[in-house]
Amino acid sequence: MAQANLSEILFKPKFKHPETSTLVRRTHCNHVVNIHSALDGDTANHWYRMINRLMWTWRGIDPLEIEEVLSRIACSKAEHSNNELLDTVVGYRNGNWIYEWANQGMMWQQKAMEETDPGSAGQFWLNAANLYSIASYPHLKGDELSEQAEVLSNRAYEEAAKYLPYTLKELTFPISDGGSLSGFLHMPTVGSAPFPTVLMCGGLDTLQSDYHRLFRDYLEPKGIAMLTIDLPSVGASSRWKLTQDTSYLHQQVLQALADVPWVDHQRVSVFGFRFGANVAVRLGYLEPQRVRAVACLGPIVHHLLCNSDSLRKVPDMYMDVMASRLGMADSTDETLNTEMNRYSLKTQGLLGRRCQTPMLAGFWENDPFSPKEEAKLICSSSADGKLLAIPSKPLYENFHRALLQTSEWLEDKMR
């Protein structure tokens, strides 16, 4: 990897790149909907993006570093596409969201290249990968600068694995439409292959490299491997649009695991965050012979997709993410809402029907996107359901405890 010049090559100015918040051409409300969510972060006055301090800190970024980068963005006097929103600086320059986070990532990349201690070098590369991922956030289709930051994130993630005490393999899976899909298999130092494996289904605004901490702290010590696959229209899966068959890609990966020698294909479970739970639960119904168990936190499987009042409270950024994933960047909210109804697993005739696959669903009280009833619907549909209530405070500690309980439950179901 030609690390020294990669960022210069990728971000070499060619033309005036469109600013992220202008890519989806729905009518933005521009009023602040006060949202506080454990998994999604907070809305903030005069910011287009949700500011997700918990998850960014959980991934390993210093909270002070987060505030430092945000302050650089907030102080910019450069041209904005929307003068009311701080993170809408036009062009790849000081104050632009992608520029500032990528610049921070490049600093850690340089430190990693100069570091002689393998453990420190690996951590520095991981820091760079996390910062490049935030630069790319929320990963809207057609955002060229964002896509270039994704390339840097994936390359840094692969570099980190060369120094850290686990094995990372990039696997390629054939897809029925003639394409191929790449995913990362993380293999533990505990035990020996073939490993029980968790197939990770992240949210619509995350990359597969964002879940390293889940593997390192919760799965790896138990001798469990983790396979990450991006959701359709995100990252390595960007060529596929998200359709009502949300598990289209993950199902084909699941069916191919019998041919992967490092994976015990008879001991595979699925873990879904947010909309990733839609994929995970769907797999529990469609592939009960291949899936030992399904776990999900803050699931989006029915309520938000079918409740117009709830959808009206969703911040602009998240509605833009949905429109981008569905290939509906020019649609009205009414058309988008109608289409989203079809993504409900209850509307599809799955949830509510008895399923033999064990399912765990965790929820936070007053979660704006996923009420307790959502998790209860999942658990009551399973012949072996477990409901996990996660207290909101203290936020970080309870998130950690929820992941511990979930990983222990998955370990038990894969024995």
UniProtKB/Swiss-Prot annotation:
* Entry keyword Ligase: no
Bilayer-spanning residue ranges: none
Give the catalysed reaction(s), semicolon-separated: a carboxylic ester + H2O = an alcohol + a carboxylate + H(+)
EC numbers: 3.1.1.1
Q: Which PANTHER family match?
A: DIENELACTONE HYDROLASE DOMAIN-CONTAINING PROTEIN-RELATED (PTHR22946), ESTERASE FRSA (PTHR22946:SF4)
Recite the UniProt keywords alphabetically.
Answer: Hydrolase, Serine esterase
Which SUPFAM superfamilies does UniProt cross-reference here? alpha/beta-Hydrolases
Q: Which Pfam families does the annotation name? A: FrsA-like
What protein is this chain from? Esterase FrsA
Q: What does this protein do?
A: Catalyzes the hydrolysis of esters.
Q: What GO molecular function annotations does the UniProt record carry, in alphabetical order? A: carboxylesterase activity; hydrolase activity
Give the lineage: Bacteria, Pseudomonadati, Pseudomonadota, Gammaproteobacteria, Enterobacterales
Family note: Belongs to the FrsA family.
Q: Which residues form a coiled coil?
A: none
Gene that codes for this? frsA
